[in-house]
A protein has these predicted regions:
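Single-residue "anchor" positions within short linear motifs
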Residues: 278-281, 298
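Leucine-biased recognition of intrinsically disordered, low-complexity hydrophobic segments
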Residues: 272-278
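Short, contiguous alpha-helical
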Residues: 117-171, 194, 211-266, 270, ...
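Active-site-adjacent scaffolding segments
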Residues: 55-110
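Acidic/histidine-rich alpha-helical segments that form the ligand environment
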Residues: 93-111, 169-209, 230-235
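Tandem repeat scaffolds
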Residues: 1-75
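N-terminal polybasic/positive-inside topogenic patches
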Residues: 274, 287, 296-298
Length: 300
């Protein structure tokens, strides 16, 4: 264990660093940026939270004695009435949720088509471009539907895109340099969305409540059994949240173009939320934490 007492570490970069169990006393974190940070079971006392923006997976967050997580969920459901339908309880609910996502994504794609094609490869505020977002959703479907539910040991298309921090895994593509056209990605997306539709339509209630069979091959997710319901909920969440991010960033790109300011700030996009990790983590109930889950609108 190393002690830093009176140290000047301003501007330091900590990446893939284990600081679990650390004690921070009278520490200046003003202006700090935390991304993909696990703050599970962190206790803060006597802190000053002024002009702070937090986007992430929030559960059991108590601020000044008040659990604010239910309040946040309720407000997001109020802003987006269809959001609550992304937590279906039965097969019919999953079908309705997928209907909603198909409709919403059709509108988002129409909006993207109104921009110059080159802007669809642009990053806004270090997030994935629109094309990269579509590639990531292909990867999500391949991983959780084609591999986990349908049992294909190697379902990935070369254009699929895992999250940036995912460890290299045999057979899993991660080509960040390829620049496919929108039409090429949409053809792939139509195929994957049709696959999800087929799975949902063919499910019985018993199958929905069942578990997948482990796929005995390296890949993602890791080889083990998963609740079928959990696999589909991950896909619904990915589709819902990433569309909101895409809408936000398309609006920024369009505004910058209209204002004649050129492209938005390009940078390598990556998304890592509190449930997005290169390694699976155990929930208190013993199940495996979904390896990624997009966070509420505002970050990826």
């Amino acid at each position: 264990m190393t002690d830093f007492i009176g140290a000047d570490l301003r501007g330091s970069r900590f990446e893939r660093t284990d600081l679990s169990g650390s004690q921070l006393w009278a520490v200046d974190l003003s202006g700090a940026g935390l991304r993909g940070v696990d703050l599970t079971r962190v206790t803060m006392r006597g802190v000053e939270l002024v002009d702070v923006s937090i986007h992430g997976e929030i559960q059991n967050l108590t601020i000044n004695g008040v659990d604010v997580a239910p309040l946040i969920d309720a407000e997001l459901d109020r802003r987006y009435p269809d959001r609550a339908k992304m937590r279906p309880a039965d097969r019919a609910g999953f079908g309705e949720a997928w209907d909603i996502l198909e409709r919403l994504w059709a509108g988002t794609v129409d909006r993207a088509r109104r921009l110059p094609p080159e802007l669809l490869h642009e990053s806004v505020d270090r997030e994935w471009s629109f094309i990269e977002t579509l590639r990531h959703l292909v990867f999500a479907t391949d991983s959780w539907v084609r591999r986990a539910i349908r049992g294909d040991p190697s379902p990935w298309d070369p254009l699929g895109l895992p999250w940036d921090e995912m460890a290299d895994t045999p057979g899993v593509p991660r080509d960040r340099d390829v620049r496919p056209s929108l039409d090429a990605l949409l053809a792939l997306r139509r195929d994957r969305m049709a696959t999800v539709r087929e799975v949902i339509d063919s499910l019985t209630e018993d199958a929905l409540d069942g578990d997948t069979q482990p796929v005995e091959a390296p890949g993602w997710p890791p080889s083990r059994s998963y609740p079928v319901r959990e696999c589909l909920l991950i896909v619904l969440n990915e589709e819902w949240e990433h569309r909101l991010y895409a809408e936000r960033d398309l609006a920024a790109l369009d505004a910058a173009r209209t204002a004649g300011q050129g492209s938005a700030r390009p940078a390598a996009g990556c998304r890592l939320s509190g449930l997005e990790s290169p390694t699976s983590q155990a929930w208190p109930n013993g199940s495996v934490k979904p390896p990624w889950r997009c966070t509420p609108h505002g970050t990826r």
